[in-house]
Amino acid sequence: MQTQVLFEHPLNEKMRTWLRIEFLIQQLTVNLPIVDHAGALHFFRNVSELLDVFERGEVRTELLKELDRQQRKLQTWIGVPGVDQSRIEALIQQLKAAGSVLISAPRIGQFLREDRLIALVRQRLSIPGGCCSFDLPTLHIWLHLPQTQRDSQVETWIASLNPLTQALTMVLDLIRQSAPFRKQTSLNGFYQDNGGDADLLRLNLSLDSQLYPQISGHKSRFAIRFMPLDSENGQVPERLDFELACC
């Protein structure tokens, strides 16, 4: 049984958006293959939320800026003794390739927006029970198509996100690896520190404590308050050890 729980908290709006996109893309594949109504609604609801996120900001522009920023950071390690130069060069080339693919790709999510079935389901998702067979006969007949035909269509939908997924995965991996976990101690359930221009907080907490963090702040300063899962009977120790990485 897992004894440590990892919490991540964004310290700016772009990181908040990226983590939401990452979460929703991961959710797209959780219940595949789609074999019934429940699996279909899970998939289409996540597609709909993903398109909503895309429409709120310049996702491609921010990712391209970050790909460029990560390349510049890696270039500062070129020629430094003891650093694996081949690894640095490989990462730089991977970032360049991801940027080229992303910049030449169609508008993010456009393929999904233009799909008739996705559009029909999106219109009904906000209506309680609005995806019944009599409301959405299109979805009803789609669910009775051969499994291979549905699988192929789902794979095509997900593949349309590959330029974004590839770039986002690289960026988030590099950010997460940019800082090590360090042991910290909270006093009376409270901890605060300077962020040092961090984009992301990562916090490892023992499951035994049955506590969760409430995090507030921004890239220059943040505060963490630990709360008991059982709000009535749970207790927060005077001193609590945890691991924190400011990435």
UniProtKB/Swiss-Prot annotation:
Checking InterPro entries in the record gives: ZapD, ZapD_C, ZapD_sf
Q: Which residues form a coiled coil?
A: none
Keyword Cell cycle part of the UniProt annotation: yes
Q: Name one Pfam family in it.
A: ZapD
Family designation: Belongs to the ZapD family.
Function of the molecule: Cell division factor that enhances FtsZ-ring assembly. Directly interacts with FtsZ and promotes bundling of FtsZ protofilaments, with a reduction in FtsZ GTPase activity.
Subunit notes for this chain?
Interacts with FtsZ.
Q: What is this protein called?
A: Cell division protein ZapD
Q: Which organism is it from?
A: Escherichia coli O7:K1 (strain IAI39 / ExPEC)
Q: What is the lineage of its organism?
A: Bacteria, Pseudomonadati, Pseudomonadota, Gammaproteobacteria, Enterobacterales
Name of the gene: zapD
